[in-house]
Curated annotation (Swiss-Prot):
Cofactors demanded by this protein: heme
Reaction(s) catalysed (UniProt annotation): 2 H2O2 = O2 + 2 H2O
Enzyme Commission code: 1.11.1.6
One Gene Ontology molecular-function label: metal ion binding
Coiled coil: none
Broad EC category: oxidoreductase
Protein name: Catalase A
Organism: Emericella nidulans (strain FGSC A4 / ATCC 38163 / CBS 112.46 / NRRL 194 / M139) (Aspergillus nidulans)
Catalytic-site annotation from UniProt: 93, 166
Similarity remark: Belongs to the catalase family.
Primary location: other
Job of this protein: Catalyzes the degradation of hydrogen peroxide (H(2)O(2)) generated by peroxisomal oxidases to water and oxygen, thereby protecting cells from the toxic effects of hydrogen peroxide.
Length: 744
């Protein structure tokens, strides 16, 4: 039974949450929301009070417990309900998480569309967003190498509009008819159901080699885009080509983009592998944590638009989902902003039962002849019926916030009761008539041609944009692509698979890349390019082109490692500075019981209770680590896991801060690294070396927590340390070969 104090606190917290984040959709689902934290007695689903939920009705006497009785309707109901709790998981995108928020239009695009959600800047449109992986099952890990789903449901005044996108702007196939074969190939192999949530197996690489249209996409999949640091730090793309139609009936073809305010950042591969076991829920917890801490994730909403009459003016077909529209040719126009500000209350009825459809569009938005989109429009509707039943749009999370009524009736799991004597149109009462002027109208696009199974010649060019993407990457991103191919193909044990992918297909993209990968995986090393690299580059294909909208360390997770005898001044000052910068400090102790500062009397001080002890966490779960000085360093020096934590932080290219005696510990751990530079006890200024920031102990906590700025050339310790965190990683540490000299 909930205590009155607990219930009161929860009620107050809920009131604050509701006031800050309430919108039309939150109000709508509130009618179907109940709170289990109540003194209300248990009842069956048919309303009968339950007096004993712990014992099945059975025949007993003083010495013997006899058979259970099937007449126990309460027990049977509980078992029946339990036996049927699971529903079919999504065939793809099964693993996911979601949150509520709002979409705000910053600039009307009435020159392109008459859709209210894209023309009325006074609106605040509720949204639900679901992020996901593609390949794995519901129980797979968050940090696998994979495309990420980025699906947005807008609850507009004219109906629901869904952008069912990904964090990569292109796809593996051009025609939806190939989707079953592609998914079969990327999923676990049929003879043994292995591997889970990975492309590192024979069937996937066999399929993509035999489908050269997949070349561009698998270059993206081998890049850092496929291992994002956070859902909050990845782009989103509509992938397909849609249409916008304005009041004059003029049509533009468009692509949709989401650009994160925090910039685009990724994990490193070793880190992603480890997190898959250490914290398989890393991404979903990261999203919930940020929202709970009011570090609300935000994205700019942008479009690319091509007038209908210009659709044939490009070297690529604009309806080909394996191609991007280079921004030099089709500029990006930022028109809105997405903010996520409310976590879900219950996973199953909200995140698991939410259902997206590419065919969910509103007046002013239309489809195109994109052959992948045409098939998706059928598939998504069909799969929701299989998963949730024909009345899936009556489920609270899926229903629109605008009034809706039609003559659809019956079917499994129908909830709505429709009064009236007719269920058809036209009818003698003129009841529930079609919309007059405000309804959806398909654009009257002219179509000529012959019925055949084929695509236009432009679809058959597969290499130019794969080269364009690779050419546009930074040096370190190219290193990661090479390593990713080497890892993936090393897991293929059929020589024909890795030999022709490394020695032939990659030689059509970039010869040095093909040679490096072939050598690593044991394939014949190609001696000449099978296709000349055109040498062209394009902006904003490298994720390094997407820096945070404002410099800072907001929502970054920073570990502070302490043991008995830590420097209290350094600890208090750094923790205060981290909080002031709107980042998240986590105290990692040698134990999760009271830890006392150097000179503190255990009898007169409460000490500090760490958030975690070191063995319960790993450096992989944090963006940076800080270690204050003090006599506790004598204890930390003898702890192998703490030493490994420091080495792993360095190996994963993260910022590392140490003061006083801790600087010497860092130097000891990094002893094999050439040229390590740290601050000595008499150093007047902090020392920054490849993202490792050290200094002598501070004179006061305020010297750390006040007056800092996130600037590269700042002179104080905090500013230098925070700047390194803001850069996400010290990539030069990897390029100069320093990270690889440390065992981690």
């Amino acid at each position: 039974m909930a205590t009155s104090i607990t219930a009161g606190l929860q009620k107050a917290q809920q009131a604050v949450q509701d006031t800050a984040t309430k919108n039309k959709k939150i109000v709508d689902i509130s009618h179907d929301t109940v709170n289990v934290h109540t003194d209300q007695e248990q009842r069956t689903d048919f309303g009968v009070a339950i007096t004993d939920p712990d014992h099945w009705l059975r025949v007993t006497n003083e010495t013997h417990s006899g058979p259970s009785l099937l007449e126990d309707h309460i027990a049977r109901e509980r078992i029946h309900r339990f036996d049927h709790e699971r529903i079919p998981e999504r065939v793809v995108h099964a693993r996911g998480t979601g949150a509520y928020g709002n979409f705000t239009l910053k600039e009307s695009i009435e020159d392109l569309t008459y859709a209210g959600v894209l023309t009325d800047t006074s609106r605040n449109t509720p949204v639900f967003v679901r992020f996901s992986t593609v390949q794995g099952s519901r129980g797979s890990a968050d940090t696998v190498r994979d495309v990420r789903g980025f699906a947005v449901k807008f609850y507009t005044d004219e109906g629901n509009w869904d952008i069912v996108g990904n964090n990569i702007p292109v796809f593996f196939i051009q025609d939806a008819i190939k989707f079953p074969d592609f998914v079969h190939a990327v999923k676990p192999e049929p003879h043994n159901e292995v591997p889970q949530a990975q492309t590192a197996h024979n069937n996937f690489w066999d399929f993509v080699y035999l489908h050269p249209e997949a070349t561009h996409m698998f270059m993206w999949a081998m890049s850092d885009r496929a291992i994002p640091r956070s859902y909050r730090m990845m782009q989103g793309f509509g992938v397909n080509t849609f249409s916008l139609v304005n009041k004059e009936g003029k049509r533009h073809f468009v692509k949709f983009h989401w650009i994160p305010h925090l910039g685009v950042h990724s994990l490193v591969w070793d880190e992603a592998l480890k997190l898959a076991g250490q914290d398989p829920d890393f991404h979903r917890k990261d999203l919930m944590e940020a929202i709970d801490n009011k570090a609300y994730p935000k994205w700019d909403f942008a479009i690319q638009a091509i007038p209908e009459e210009d659709q044939d003016k490009f070297e690529f077909d604009i309806f080909d989902a394996t191609k991007v529209w280079p921004e030099e040719q089709v500029p990006l126009r930022v028109v809105g902003e997405l903010e996520l500000n409310r976590n879900i209350d219950e996973f199953f009825p909200e995140t698991e039962q939410v259902a997206f459809c590419t065919s969910h569009i509103v007046p002013g938005i239309d489809f195109s002849d994109d052959p992948l989109l045409q098939g998706r429009n059928f598939s998504y509707q069909d799969t929701q019926i299989s998963r949730l039943g024909v009345n899936w749009e009556e489920i609270p999370i899926n229903r629109p916030v605008c009034p809706f009524l039609n003559h659809n009736r019956d079917g499994a799991k129908r909830h709505r009761i429709t009064k009236g004597t007719v269920n058809y149109w036209p009818n003698r009462f003129e009841a529930n008539p079609p919309a007059s002027d405000k309804g959806f109208k398909s654009h009257p696009a002219p179509i000529t041609g012959r019925k055949r199974r084929d695509l236009t010649p432009k679809f058959k060019e597969y290499h130019n944009q794969a080269q364009l993407f690779y050419n546009s990457l930074s040096e370190v991103e190219k290193v990661h692509v090479k390593k990713a191919f080497s890892f993936e193909l090393d897991h293929c044990d059929d020589p024909i698979v890795y030999e022709r992918l490394a020695g032939q297909r990659l030689a059509e993209i970039d010869l040095p890349l093909a040679q490096a990968v072939a050598e690593m995986v044991g394939a014949p090393i190609p001696t000449k390019a099978l296709r000349d690299n055109h040498g062209k580059t394009s902006v904003r294909l490298s994720q390094f082109d997407f820096t945070p909208k404002a410099p800072g360390i907001i929502s970054r997770r920073i570990a502070i490692i302490i043991g008995d005898g830590y420097d209290k001044i350094a600890f208090n000052g750094m923790k205060a500075a981290i909080l002031a910068a709107q980042a998240l400090p986590f105290v990692i102790g040698t134990k999760r019981s009271a830890i006392y500062a150097q000179g503190e009397d255990k009898n007169s001080s409460k000490g500090v209770i760490p958030d975690h002890m070191y063995d319960g966490m790993r450096s992989t779960m944090f963006d940076a680590t800080f270690i204050p000085g003090g006599s506790h360093i004598e204890t930390l020096q003898k702890n192998g896991q703490i030493r490994y934590w420091i080495a792993e932080t360095f190996g994963h290219l993260k910022a590392l801060g140490a003061m006083g005696e801790a600087a010497q510990l860092v130097k000891e751990v990094l002893g094999n690294v050439m040229g390590v530079q740290i601050a000595g006890a008499d150093s007047a200024e902090p020392v920054e070396w490849y993202g490792v920031v050290t200094a002598r102990g501070p004179e006061s906590a305020e010297s750390l927590s006040e007056g800092f700025k996130v600037l590269k050339d700042a002179g104080d310790f905090t500013s230098k340390f925070f700047y390194q965190i803001s850069q996400h990683r010290n990539w030069q540490r990897e390029l100069d070969g320093l990270a690889s000299t440390v065992a981690f």
